[in-house]
């Protein structure tokens, strides 16, 4: 393989695309001593920007509740722009579904932890995410849906 045909994977830009924090029950919520229940919802998205530039993002929503009272709500979308060249087309879904999110996630985790601290709460560290397992599950679900659509 010549240098011109070598696979290229470069991070062009990592950035916070969207960030919001709400503390709807402040200041009373700061008097609470119990640990809140945490609910974390996460999604990923990838798309082509042009022939060799791709955008990948992870959106997370973290809701901390004590009973029916919301202590805080954080929504964050961390994104990256990647230059990807000379990667076989059949491998692109894996690069976009596993490789890019694995690079973006640590930055998302840091941003969420920082904003929770700035909102006056103890640090929140998001648990590591196995993007490979999520990718495999999504592929299996798509294959099952395709199989079900063909039988109807």
Swiss-Prot record:
SUPFAM superfamilies from the xrefs? SecB-like
Which GO molecular function terms does the record list? Answer: unfolded protein binding
Location relative to the cell: Cytoplasm
What's a single GO BP term from this record? Answer: protein transport
Instruction: Give the Pfam families listed for this entry.
Output: SecB (PF02556)
Any single GO CC term annotated in Swiss-Prot or TrEMBL for this entry: cytoplasm
Signal peptide from the UniProt entry = none
Top-rank taxon: Bacteria
InterPro entries membership = SecB, SecB-like_sf
Task: Provide the primary localization.
Answer: cytoplasm
Keyword terms of this UniProt record: Chaperone, Cytoplasm, Protein transport, Translocation, Transport
Describe the family membership recorded for this protein in Swiss-Prot or TrEMBL.
Answer: Belongs to the SecB family.
What this protein is reported to do is described as:
One of the proteins required for the normal export of preproteins out of the cell cytoplasm. It is a molecular chaperone that binds to a subset of precursor proteins, maintaining them in a translocation-competent state. It also specifically binds to its receptor SecA.
Subunit structure as annotated in this protein's UniProt entry: Homotetramer, a dimer of dimers. One homotetramer interacts with 1 SecA dimer.
State the PANTHER family in the record: PROTEIN-EXPORT PROTEIN SECB (PTHR36918:SF1), PTHR36918
What name is this protein filed under? Protein-export protein SecB
Give the organism's phylogenetic lineage: Bacteria, Pseudomonadati, Pseudomonadota, Betaproteobacteria, Nitrosomonadales
């Amino acid at each position: 393989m010549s240098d011109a045909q070598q696979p290229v994977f470069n991070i062009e830009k990592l950035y916070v695309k969207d960030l919001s924090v709400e503390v709807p029950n402040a200041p009373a919520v700061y008097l609470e001593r119990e640990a809140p229940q945490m609910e974390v919802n996460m999604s990923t998205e990838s798309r082509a920007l042009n022939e060799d530039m791709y955008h990948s993002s992870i959106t997370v929503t973290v809701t901390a509740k004590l009973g029916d009272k919301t202590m805080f709500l954080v929504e964050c979308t961390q994104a990256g722009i990647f230059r990807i060249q000379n990667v076989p087309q059949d491998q692109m879904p894996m690069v976009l579904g596993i490789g890019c999110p694995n690079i973006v996630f640590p930055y998302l985790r840091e941003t969420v932890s920082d904003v929770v601290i700035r909102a006056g709460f103890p640090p929140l560290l998001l648990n590591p995410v196995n993007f490979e397992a999520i990718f495999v599950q999504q592929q299996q679900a798509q294959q099952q849906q395709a199989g079900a659509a063909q039988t109807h």
